[in-house]
Amino acid sequence: MADSQTATSAPEFKSAHFIGIGGAGMSGIALVLHERGYAVTGSDLKTSRYIRQLTRAGVKVHVGHEAATIDEVKPDVVVVSTAIPESNPELVRARELGIPVWPRAKMLSALGHGYTTVAVAGTHGKTTTSSMCATMLDRMGLDPSFLIGGIVEGYDTNGKNGSGDYFVAEADESDSSFLFLNPNVVIVTNVEADHLDHYSGIEEIEATFAKFMSLVGEDGTVIVCGEDPHLVELAKSTGRHVLSYGFAESNDIVCMHPDVKGIQSDFIVRFEDGTEHAVEIKSNPGRHNMLNATAVLTVAHVLGLDIDAAAKALSSFEGVRRRFTHVGDIDGITVVDDYGHHPTEIKATLAAASSLGYKHVDVVFQPHRYSRLQALCDDFADAFANADKLLLIDVFSAGEMPIPGVTSKMLADTVRAKHPDKEVVYCSSRLELNQELEQMVGEGDLLLTMGAGDVTTVGPEFIEYLTAKKDA
């Protein structure tokens, strides 16, 4: 476990070593720290897109974890994620040498010192919403710094050190580490049961989110989605200034007159003073993304920015990689990849996909974590209502040990039991999957790959499979 003191001031060290630097969150923090002139090194078990990004920027990354690495780089501080066990040889050596060990979120908090910090949290939607916020501020010429758990399209990075006064941070609730942050404005998109490997249940999750919302202080603002009235009540229980947003007239900021044109969404946002502003989102379809955009415009409102200029800037948002990302087309089949790995995310994405006019919406889903599948199996089974065909591949463990009986085949059986008319296939190998897809998916269909694991490779592999057969 990392040292527990909260970071409330700018970093006073000169060098930092990141154990597990290849993750989406860790790599962004390391990149921004490097861009600010600190000496940054890191290590991870294997190379990745994020590590290649860091290497190009000039960060030295060791592949593999060895105690000797700590002796070599002699960092002033070591940064770890909760995925790093106490037995990690680099962590053990750092402790032996008395080097301070910081959790990822403490370093994130330190990087936000001296900035107006906007922190975006929620069970779903936080990566897209924080990316929208960073894009809006940047396209308004405000040059924000940002740290986000995904690659922001148009910037090709998950972290950026800007010269402006604003700092946008995706706040991770998965291990309560977002409690290290010191935000001025908070967005909470939703609160649901998830990460039950860390939390005892929804009550503990809600209590932790309430603590997080309290971090803004009495002069801050908490922006919450009013589609869940209980979330609004939870936010107001903190005694902080709360603004709710949503489609219902009861909200402080109202999303009105939604008009979906393919993947483009047009709508109106009305503020408390009655002023109305037209908004256009050219990527990331669906009502849930209209809500995300409304939350971001509310940030502009709270910061005293010109709302029409903010809406125009927001219209240039190009999306986030692995959030309804177009992979390619082959034989009249459109292939899209999406990170959705929780039932609510899946429902929202499929609702958006079903409105796009494809002949069929066919899904390849890879459950992420045995604990999540065990806790939410029935919810997963119901989440695929808008999928015409469902293909399941083996669980991506994310480092968890298997739980006896908790498998993708179990989920397939549950879907069949609850929805007998649904076409469901479990595939035990990628070859079997490609063969099934070849038979099941046709011209005019949307093939949607979903999950937080390596299911992202399914789309490109299927395109290569069909291309090779055509060229043979």
Labelled PLM ranges:
Residues G220, D388, D445:
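Glycine-centered, small-residue-biased loops immediately flanking beta-strands
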Residues E12-I29, A39-L45, V320, T344, ...:
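Active-site beta-alpha connecting loops in nucleotide-dependent enzymes
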Residues P11-S15, I19, L54, Y199-E206, ...:
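Adenine nucleotide phosphate-binding catalytic loops in nucleotide-utilizing enzymes
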Residues A39-D44, S145-F146, S244:
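Short beta-strand "acidic-cap" motif of Rossmann-like dinucleotide-binding folds
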Residues T8, V32-E35, T55, T69-I70, ...:
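Phosphate-binding loop of NTP-binding sites
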Residues S15-F18, V78, V118, P144, ...:
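Conserved hydrophobic helix-helix packing surfaces used for dimerization/oligomerization
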Residues E72-V77, D165, G442-D445:
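Short acidic/histidine-rich motifs immediately flanking catalytic phosphotransfer sites
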Residues M1-P103, M107, P229, V254-H257, ...:
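N-terminal leader/targeting and accessory segments in enzymes
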